[in-house]
């Protein structure tokens, strides 16, 4: 899973920002007012995993990319068994340092950003056997090249390049950083990331041939077809077709239907599978049963479409448990367009998804989940001018943690969320009951 992410000059984030996400649980929320940068975090991870176009902070236009050096740094807590080969060797070296790195090892300018991560590391150490896990900041910069962000220090250099000749240098050179490419590639290859933005087209997203749906199913349509239409069956089809052509040639005597090459081409497995996908799967659209009728998803309301996406993800993961083992799902505003009465059920479904996947991330304006979700973490994001503040709370004891942070900050934190969370939850439950009464009565 990703316990946090460093962002540098990405969208609303100027300079270096560290956003904590979790101390170990897979249910992770981001809440805060409009414009504070919740969606930017989910989008940046989509850039990291799926090579989407980067959206830079406006400062980069004035100062240039070389000067600002934008980057995205997810900090991964992953089982050692996930990696192998050379990537695992690199991970061993890097993780052994990161598990034990201290504030004194970090450059002075970066120490304030590092403290939140250090607090997380200390908390995580109390809950897991760290010998079973790698802790890895995996960095790509705006050029798509490996980097180490604030971790490019002497301690890390000595671990990764123990026999370096330039003893007086305190960081890895760009050439030395290239050695981490194998680790970056392996992590991105081993973990799948599905991002569901607020403005997603549900009709396209839910088609069977999309990559996202196939990831949720745990296998591709081609893999499914290989089981349903075997090589033996394809061989038999080719034999029958060739027999037909041979018989036709005998009837035509000096004429024959042939391919341009001397070797006559048969129907390939990929040809047949592509035809089946095009003629069978692509024409099928998601429908929802309402009464005795089936309604195509495009005929549903905006709220029903949003609910359908979460329902599909939940049910596919529920019945294909292996598909979620290395899957991170990120949802932007899952409550978008939903009636208040449906919010509670939507977030309950999100929680269940988090139990069957590597991690569930979401950005939301709805606080009603805080009092009722059993386990998980929420990051409250606030902003003053260009400065962001990130406060991570354990949902098992969020009331106590909020109270303590308010005391420690001398009342400077915007923690009216205790009232807002209860208010949102009560509204959702009451309205849901009213809807049931109206339907029954």
Kindly give the residue locations of the regions a language model identified.
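RecA-like P-loop NTPase motor core
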Residues: 371-441
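Walker B catalytic acidic pair
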Residues: 332-334
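Extended helical coiled-coil dimerization/tether regions that scaffold
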Residues: 194, 202-328
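Flexible phosphate/Mg2+-sensing switch loops adjacent to catalytic phosphate-binding sites
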Residues: 50-76, 84-87, 168-180, 319-324, ...
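H-loop/switch region of ABC-family ATPase nucleotide-binding domains
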Residues: 363-365
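Pre-Walker A-like glycine/lysine-rich segment at the N-terminus of P-loop NTPase domains
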Residues: 1-50, 60-67
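Electropositive, glycine-dotted interaction segments
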Residues: 90-223
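Conserved P-loop NTP-binding catalytic core
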Residues: 43-130
């Amino acid at each position: 899973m990703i316990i946090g992410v460093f962002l540098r000059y990405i969208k609303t984030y100027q300079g270096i920002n560290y956003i904590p996400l979790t101390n170990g649980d897979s249910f992770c929320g981001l809440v805060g007012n409009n414009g504070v940068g919740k969606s930017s975090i989910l989008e940046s991870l989509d850039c990291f995993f799926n090579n989407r176009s980067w959206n830079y902070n406006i400062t980069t236009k004035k100062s240039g990319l070389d000067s600002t050096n934008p980057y995205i740094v997810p900090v991964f807590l992953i089982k050692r068994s996930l990696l192998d080969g050379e990537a695992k060797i690199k991970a061993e070296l890097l993780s052994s340092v990161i598990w034990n790195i201290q504030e004194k090892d970090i450059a002075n300018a970066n120490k304030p950003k590092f403290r939140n991560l250090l607090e997380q590391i200390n908390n995580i150490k109390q809950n897991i056997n760290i010998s079973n896990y790698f802790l890895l900041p995996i960095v790509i910069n705006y050029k798509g090249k490996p980097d180490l962000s604030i971790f490019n220090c002497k301690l890390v250099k000595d671990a990764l390049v123990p026999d370096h000749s330039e003893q007086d240098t305190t960081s890895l050179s760009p050439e030395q950083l290239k050695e981490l490419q194998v680790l970056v590639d392996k992590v991105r290859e081993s973990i799948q990331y599905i991002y569901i933005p607020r403005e997603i087209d549900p009709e396209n997203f839910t088609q069977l041939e999309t990559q996202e749906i196939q990831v949720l199913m745990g296998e591709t349509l081609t893999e499914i077809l290989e089981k349903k239409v075997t090589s033996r069956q394809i061989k038999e089809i080719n034999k029958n077709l060739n027999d037909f052509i041979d018989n036709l040639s005998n009837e035509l005597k000096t004429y024959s239907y042939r391919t341009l090459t001397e070797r006559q081409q048969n129907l390939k497995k990929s040809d047949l599978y592509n035809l089946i996908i095009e003629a069978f799967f692509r024409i099928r659209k998601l429908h929802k049963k309402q009464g005795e009728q089936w309604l195509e998803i495009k005929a549903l309301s905006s709220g029903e479409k949003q609910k359908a996406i979460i329902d599909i993800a939940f049910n596919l993961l529920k019945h294909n448990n292996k598909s979620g083992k290395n899957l991170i799902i990120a949802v932007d505003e899952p409550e978008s367009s939903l009636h208040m009465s449906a919010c509670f059920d939507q977030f309950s479904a999100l929680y269940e998804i988090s139990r069957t996947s590597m991690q569930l991330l979401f950005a939301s304006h709805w606080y009603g989940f805080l009092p009722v979700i059993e386990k998980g973490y929420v990051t409250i994001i606030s902003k003053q001018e260009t400065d962001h503040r990130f406060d991570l709370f354990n949902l098992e004891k969020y009331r106590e943690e909020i109270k303590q942070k308010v005391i420690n900050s001398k009342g400077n934190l915007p923690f009216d969320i205790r009232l807002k969370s209860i208010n949102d939850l009560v509204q959702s439950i009451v309205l849901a009951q009213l809807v049931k009464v109206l339907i029954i009565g």
